[in-house]
Curated annotation (Swiss-Prot):
Binds and hydrolyzes ATP via the two cytoplasmic ABC transporter nucleotide-binding domains. The two ATP-binding domains interact with each other, forming a head-to-tail dimer. Normal ATPase activity requires interaction between the two domains. The first ABC transporter nucleotide-binding domain has no ATPase activity by itself. The PDZ-binding motif mediates interactions with GOPC and with the SLC4A7, NHERF1/EBP50 complex. One of its GO terms (cellular component) is apical plasma membrane. It comes from Callithrix jacchus. Glycans are attached at residues 894, 900, 909. Belongs to the ABC transporter superfamily. ABCC family. CFTR transporter (TC 3.A.1.202) subfamily. Residues 99-122, 217-222, 320-339, 880-918, 1012-1013, 1117-1130 are extracellular. Residues 1453-1481 are annotated as: Disordered. CDD domains: ABC_6TM_CFTR_D1, ABC_6TM_CFTR_D2, ABCC_CFTR1, ABCC_CFTR2. Residues 654-831 are annotated as: Disordered R region. This is Cystic fibrosis transmembrane conductance regulator. Residues 1-77, 147-195, 244-298, 359-858, 940-990, 1035-1095, 1152-1481 are cytoplasmic.
Length: 1481
């Protein structure tokens, strides 16, 4: 960044903002880069400002019982704020004085007053000087106030961030990220813009008093008629404002519904295409858009009347002020002109400045109070510790996540009693408040000596993470004692990476020790990974470490914890993302050897780790189930240990599976003194596990990648969803967010008893900060969010490091920091995260305007209609002027002219009544025309917005995946939320305002030019100067605005990153470093914003200077060239003053239109995306010349009838090559094989080898070359939709959209209820659907959060059965399933798809056994394609993956199927829980 010229600028340069000239020149000539921006003055740096405010706030906290943030702000900024307020007032006073001089000038032309004629020229000079003084006072004052507003915002931003880092975990659970971002963005932006208006709260009343005094002198009591009308008008506008808010609130709900479905569609676009649901989704979204647009139109009409009321009020104010006086006493022209000028200023003060100022104060004080409350929230306290202590001790420790739960618990119980809940009802329910009453840990005791390893195991949600939080001081014990030495290092369960290099992430502010660093890297197996990067350990990781795989992130997090020299190491499930082999090696080399003499507490679920630990603590529902050594465990709890030991290769399971089994086992053995309990009782019992939910609610412990939150299980009455629903003041969303749950708990919930919680389920929930820290991100819940699975930017990772999940969720993989807003509040969030879809020019092109205008044929007619009405108004005025000029002199025909719509006012001394009748008649006609000029325009522009939305939606749905893969989900969603909101709300009225203002100016210039042709000569250069100046300024200002938006994103991204790693930050004491980083991000944004404000002021001042010159010219031309007659001079000068303020407004309005039209440019960019249907897939020859031949798709006769093709499901694949994006690396190369009808083929390969990619290629979702035939029909001889309908798909990431069960199973409404129920029976879904009220009409929300992962898989299965597909593609259907659901899916597959071709990508051995052929993919190619016997005989991947004992088990299958074309699948014995095993290769 360059040094700012401001530092060396002279006073004159600062006054006229000339110091910004170099940047304006540069921006006009070339594209601005960040390096071109000037550094901020030291007075504006976040460090200085935050220190100043923090000091005053601390003083306030220390000195008072009720500290007020406004007092601290006052002490920091009051005097400068007052100084600029006085300048502003003096500038405004000049406005009030100008009409006096105008009156004197007009009076000097009265034939009876020749004595004053000689001083007219001096009065003219005085009038011009007032304009110059006003310009020199107002602009520095407004800029100064904007500057103070900016400084206040920066100081408060910093204070909020510092406070966030100190908040206790209890408080963090009550605040959602959405609220925090809203606190920073929404509330604080009010200061930037609003502070300039704040002073009008006292300036406007003073101005009104002064003006009323001056008008009283002219018109006596009748002056108050005009004022009365203005006050009534202001109240009328307030009423309209309230009505508008009502419509907007109603509309917000509709927008929400549309955006929820749109976001679900965008996030699951791959599934939408695979299912051929494009038309169904389009129809669904368009229907929601229709109802939304009805309310949009109502709100727009109200806003239109509100806006036009201001324009049309000018005539009435003058009319009502003058009429009573004229009727009683008659009137002279000088008074009328002076009154008109006074009334223009008066109207501005009463209807605009004062209401805006009141609104600003209301908003600002509200924001300050919110921030004040936030700054007084409870902070976390580090535990008191003793450095001489060597052991770690916990004595009788009990802890709650909530405080004050007792009272709430009582209230909930009382409420339940009132509802007369029967005790013997099997469907027990608990409210979220009963959860509050459950301690997360109770009576925990243990003691470990220095150098010992304590392994903590337990059921899902038993309190394992909470135990570590207690030791770190994040959770305060309500009773009991904790002792340790205080030097702690911590590794979080969810690996957290800060922006920076790998080295910085590991050292993390601790002093650098080369030997220690190398040892740690070796022990954590990072050497090989680091060597792959060209920059080695200096490679920079973006937000969230996006260039890394989950395993690499986990190892870096562990390395960070190990590198710090501490007495106690807390390791919270550090091996979650690692494969079995790596985990074993790291456990040995790192935990057992490198840290052998350190005290370690390891949360784990592996038997091997328990065996090696010095002590074991097993937790269940917050209590200690067992504490002691492994041998004691075998002696004291023989049932439990033998149960776990009885699993073959328990440690080989994925961590999710292990936890599922562990939870179930603990449940069974912990009931009623370990007495044997029947399965049905276990089912019942599972509803009582409030402890599990209580802990789960907070920590989402052992959450899988796609974890979701469940509601409390409740009785069938929807009202009882929350125990104390009606009486609680706490908002509903707060309580609903409390219970996160993960897929792994599924095995525990009885399959049939997911009770529905009624319509209230549809209330939006939001995610607390604490949930986000523990990664519990809801599926499909948030609008501004990506899937958690894809936290890595895949395009940057070497191909070998891609995980299956990466590849499958490729299109969402490039998001940054958007998984954050759980309440859909796009107003708060849309501005916070900049999406870099900004490859559009800095200024909107004419082509965009032309396309926009011609989009709807009526729009051109409406614009012509506006012009015709305008010409009628000007013509009427000119006719009246012509009549006036030809009136005999003795009648003293005089005329006045009202500001806005060219109404001519004729009043004579002799026939006041008669003339007023004519005047009112003409004015009313023009008024009616004027009113209806705008309505058709606003109506038509909203229709244009509707067309744009429809075209864009269609384009996105029809775009090829290769195009969508290059876009961010957040970027696409911003088009549908932010840009469509601009097209609906802001653009129509801004265009109307601009056209209105432009016509007023043209009309005024026309009238003045008719009266005094010389003045026309002065207006031509003025308008030319204004057009050139605007073009010059726009180039730079739009680029600065763009840079400012880009600069805003890092602030919020940093906030989110800090919150995710807050526990790590605090454990390592790195808060000061992160505050510095935050201040850097703030300063970068400030530099852009300050420069934007300065250039804007430069522009406004130049415009004002041009008008001052114009006014001087007009004044002297009219004074020197006009002969007798007050009328002409009066009209000319009044209009010239008018032209000045209106044209400035018009210029600003034109800049607004240009900014808003950028949204239209972005929407057009999406509309112009290529479509999928036209993409040939044959071989490269077909489209070498880049031209797409429509002739290529020839309707194939076999496909004419849906029931004929495909009949058998035979597939032939020839030379298939697949890429994600055009010109990218080939993920699969020259794949060739064939599949017989009805055959089952298993895909094998390492993670990231391209198994899921192959399935996507079959569906033509990728850029493919080569050929595939199904039953002899080639894929480029039929349409894309027909091809995809041949396949049934069960993807890894299940897509459930917001809608009824029926809609989810059959979005095109092709099947009757009877057929749907029949299929539901086949796949085992009937019992699930029947649990819900409304059955098939029950509405699923939030990605089907009330369904388990298994139920969702069954939904996919049902869709495939309904589609009558002959080929079924399964992508890891059992990834997160418990044994029970898995059996249901296996059974359904055997029955419903007995004669279908099945292609299976799976990690479980027993699922693979049912396949006749196996395709082994390695290094993007087919390595082997053989039967299971051949694979077991050779040295293949499959053989390596299976242990010797398993091979012995499998032999019977091998031998029996040797000579059969197809084994008897039905004869395979059902697997028991113990036989489930993973084959992650």
């Amino acid at each position: 960044m360059q040094r700012s010229p401001l530092e060396k600028a002279s006073v004159v340069s600062k006054l006229f903002f000339s110091w910004t000239r170099p940047i304006l020149k540069k921006g006009y000539r070339q594209r601005l880069e960040l390096s071109d921006i000037y550094q901020i003055p030291s007075a504006d740096s976040a460090d200085n400002l935050s220190e100043k405010l923090e000091r005053e706030w601390d003083r306030e906290l220390a000195s008072k019982k009720n500290p007020k943030l406004i007092n601290a702000l006052r002490r920091c900024f009051f005097w400068r704020f007052t100084f600029y307020g006085i300048l502003l007032y003096l500038g405004e006073v000049t406005k009030a004085v100008q009409p006096l001089l105008l009156g004197r000038i007009i009076a000097s032309y009265d034939p009876d007053n020749k004595t004053e004629r000689s001083i007219a020229i001096y009065l003219g000079i005085g009038l011009c000087l007032l304009f110059i003084v006003r310009t020199l006072l107002l602009h520095p004052a407004i800029f100064g106030l904007h500057h103070i507003g900016m400084q206040m915002r920066i100081a408060m931003f910093s204070l909020i961030y510092k406070k966030t880092l100190k908040l206790s975990s209890r408080v963090l659970d009550k605040i959602s990220i959405g609220q925090l971002v809203s606190l920073l963005s929404n509330n604080l932006n009010k200061f930037d813009e609003g502070l300039a208006l704040a002073h009008f709260v006292w300036i406007a009343p003073l101005q009104v008093a002064l003006l009323m005094g001056l008008i009283w002198e002219l018109l006596q009591a009748s002056a108050f008629c005009g004022l009365g009308f203005l006050i009534v008008l202001a109240l009328f506008q307030a009423g309209l404002g309230r009505m508008m808010m009502k419509y907007r609130d109603q509309r917000a709900g509709k927008i929400n519904e549309r955006l929820v479905i749109t976001s679900e569609m965008i996030e699951n676009i791959q599934s939408v295409k695979a299912y051929c649901w494009e038309e169904a989704m389009e129809k669904m979204i368009e229907n929601l858009r229709q109802t939304e647009l009805k309310l949009t139109r109502k709100a727009a009409y109200v806003r239109y009347f509100n806006s036009s009321a201001f324009f049309f009020s000018g005539f009435f104010v003058v009319f009502l002020s003058v009429l009573p006086y004229a009727l009683i006493k008659g009137i002279i022209l000088r008074k009328i002109f002076t009154t008109i000028s006074f009334c223009i200023v008066l109207r501005m003060a009463v209807t605009r400045q004062f209401p805006w100022a009141v609104q600003t104060w209301y908003d600002s004080l509200g924001a300050i109070n919110k921030i004040q409350d936030f700054l007084q929230k409870q902070e976390y306290k580090t535990l008191e510790y003793n450095l001489t202590t060597t052991e770690v001790v916990m004595e009788n420790v009990t802890a709650f996540w909530e405080e004050g739960f007792g009272e709430l618990f009582e209230k909930a119980k009382q409420n339940n009693n009132n509802r007369k809940t029967s005790n013997d009802d099997n469907n027990l329910f608990f409210s979220n408040f009963s959860l509050l009453g459950t301690p997360v840990l109770k009576d925990i005791n243990f003691k470990i000596e220095r150098g010992q390893l304590l392994a903590v195991a337990g059921s899902t949600g038993a309190g394992k993470t909470s135990l570590l939080m207690m030791i770190m001081g994040e959770l305060e014990p309500s009773e009991g004692k904790i002792k340790h030495s205080g030097r702690i290092s911590f590794c979080s369960q969810f690996s957290w990476i800060m922006p920076g290099t790998i080295k910085e992430n590991i050292i993390f502010g601790v002093s650098y020790d080369e030997y220690r660093y190398r040892s740690v890297i070796k022990a954590c197996q990072l050497e090989e990974d680091i060597s792959k990067f060209a920059e080695k350990d200096n490679i920079v990781l973006g937000e969230g470490g996006i260039t890394l795989s989950g395993g690499q992130r986990a190892r870096i997090s562990l390395a960070r914890a190990v590198y710090k020299d501490a007495d106690l190491y807390l390791l919270d499930s550090p091996f979650g993302y690692l494969d079995v082999l790596t985990e074993k090696e790291i456990f040995e080399s790192c935990v057992c050897k490198l840290m052998a003499n350190k005290t370690r507490i390891l949360v784990t679920s592996k038997m091997e780790h328990l065996k090696k630990a010095d002590k074991i603590l097993i937790l269940h529902e917050g209590s200690s189930y067992f504490y002691g050594t492994f041998s004691e465990l075998q002696n004291l709890r023989p049932d439990f240990s033998s149960k776990l030991m009885g699993y073959d290769s328990f440690d080989q399971f994925s961590s999710e599976r292990r936890n599922s089994i562990l939870t179930e086992t603990l449940r069974r053995f912990s009931l009623e003194g370990d007495a044997p309990v029947s399965w049905t009782e276990t089912k019942k019992q599972s509803f009582k596990q409030t402890g599990e939910f209580g802990e789960k609610r907070k920590n989402s412990i052992l959450n899988s990648i796609n974890s979701i939150r469940k509601f409390s299980i409740v009785q069938k009455t929807p009202l009882q969803m929350n125990g104390i629903e009606e009486d609680s003041d706490e908002p509903l969303e707060r309580r609903l967010s409390l219970v996160p749950d993960s897929e792994q708990g599924e095995a525990i919930l009885p399959r049939i008893s997911v009770i529905n919680t009624g319509p209230a389920l549809q209330v939006r929930r939001r995610q607390s900060v604490l949930n986000m820290m523990t990664h519990s991100v809801n599926q499909g819940q948030s609008i501004h969010r990506k899937t958690t699975a894809s936290t890595r930017k895949v395009s940057l990772a070497p191909q070998a490091n891609l995980t299956e999940l990466d590849i499958y969720s490729r299109r969402l993989s490039q998001e940054t920091g958007l998984e954050i807003s759980e309440e859909i509040n796009e107003e708060d969030l849309k501005e916070c995260f900049f999406d870099d879809m900004e490859s559009i020019p800095a200024v909107t092109t004419w082509n965009t305007y032309l396309r926009y205008i011609t989009l709807h044929k009526s729009l051109i007619f409406v614009l012509i209609w506006c012009l015709v009405i305008f010409l009628a108004e000007v013509a009427a005025s000119l006719v009246v002027l012509w009549l006036l000029r030809n009136t005999p002199f003795q009648d003293k025909g005089n005329s006045t002219y009202s500001r806005n719509n060219s109404y001519a006012v004729i009043i004579t001394n002799t026939s006041s009544y008669y003339v007023f009748y004519i005047y009112v008649g003409v004015a009313d006609t023009l008024l009616a025309l004027g009113f209806f000029r705008g309505l058709p325009l606003v109506h038509t522009l909203i229709t244009v917005s509707k067309i744009l939305h429809h075209k864009m939606l269609h384009s996105v749905l029809q775009a090829p995946m290769s195009t969508l893969n290059t876009l961010k989900a957040g970027g696409i969603l911003n088009r549908f939320s932010k840009d469509i909101a601009i097209l609906d709300d802001l653009l129509p009225l801004t265009i109307f305002d601009f056209i209105q203002l432009l016509l007023i100016v043209i009309g005024a210039i026309a009238v003045v030019s008719v009266l005094q042709p010389y003045i026309f000569l002065a207006t031509v250069p003025v308008i030319a100067a204004f057009v050139l100046l605007r073009a010059y300024f726009l180039q730079t200002s739009q680029q600065l605005k763009q840079l400012e938006s880009a600069g805003r994103s890092p602030i919020f991204t940093h906030l989110v990153t800090s919150l995710k790693g807050l526990w790590t930050l605090r454990a390592f004491g790195r808060q000061p470093y992160f505050e510095t980083l935050f201040h850097k991000a703030l300063n970068l944004h400030t530099a852009n914003w300050f420069l934007y404000l300065s250039t804007l002021r430069w522009f406004q001042m130049r415009i004002e200077m041009i008008f001052v010159i114009f006014f001087i010219a007009v004044t002297f031309i009219s004074i020197l060239t006009t002969g007798e007659g007050e009328g002409t001079v009066g009209i000319i000068l009044t209009l010239a003053m008018n032209i000045m303020s209106t044209l400035q407004w018009a210029v600003n309005s034109s800049i607004d239109v240009d900014s808003l039209m950028r949204s239209v440019s972005r929407v057009f960019k999406f509309i112009d995306m290529p479509t999928e249907e036209g993409k040939p897939t044959k071989s490269t020859k077909a489209y070498k010349n880049g031209q797409l031949s429509k002739v290529m798709i020839i309707e194939n006769s076999h496909v004419k009838k849906d029931d004929i093709w495909p009949s058998g499901g035979q597939m032939t694949i020839k030379d298939l090559t697949a890429k994600y994006i055009e010109g990218g690396n080939a993920i699969l190369e020259n794949i060739s094989f064939s599949i017989s009808p009805g055959q089952r083929v298993g895909l094998l390969g390492r993670t990231g080898s391209g198994k899921s990619t192959l399935l996507s290629a079959f569906l033509r979702l990728l850029n493919t070359e080569g050929e595939i035939q199904i039953d002899g029909v080639s894929w480029d001889s039929i349409t894309l939709q027909q091809w995809r309908k041949a396949f049934g798909v069960i993807p890894q990431k299940v897509f459930i959209f917001t809608g009824t069960f029926r809609k989810n199973l059959d979005p095109y409404e092709q099947w009757s209820d009877q057929e749907i129920w029949k299929v539901a029976d086949e796949v085992g879904l009937r019992t699930v659907i029947e649990q819900f009220p409304g059955k098939l009409d029950f509405v699923l929300v939030d990605g089907g959060c009330v369904l388990s992962h298994g139920h969702k898989q069954l939904m996919c299965l049902a869709r495939s059965v309904l589609s009558k597909a002959k080929i079924l593609l399964l992508d890891e259907p059992s990834a997160h399933l418990d044994p029970v659901t898995y059996q249901i899916i296996r059974r359904a597959l055997k029955q419903a798809f007995a004669d279908c071709t099945v292609i299976l990508c799976e990690h479980r051995i027993e699922a693979m056994l049912e396949c006749q052929q196996f395709l082994v993919i390695e290094e993007n190619k087919v390595r082997q394609y053989d039967s299971i016997q051949k694979l077991l005989n050779e040295k293949s991947l499959f053989r390596q993956a299976i242990s010797h004992s398993d091979r012995v088990k499998l032999f019977p299958h091998r031998n029996s199927s040797k000579y059969k074309s197809r084994p008897q699948i039905a004869s395979l014995k059902e697997e028991t829980e113990e036989e489930v095993q993973e084959t992650r290769l």
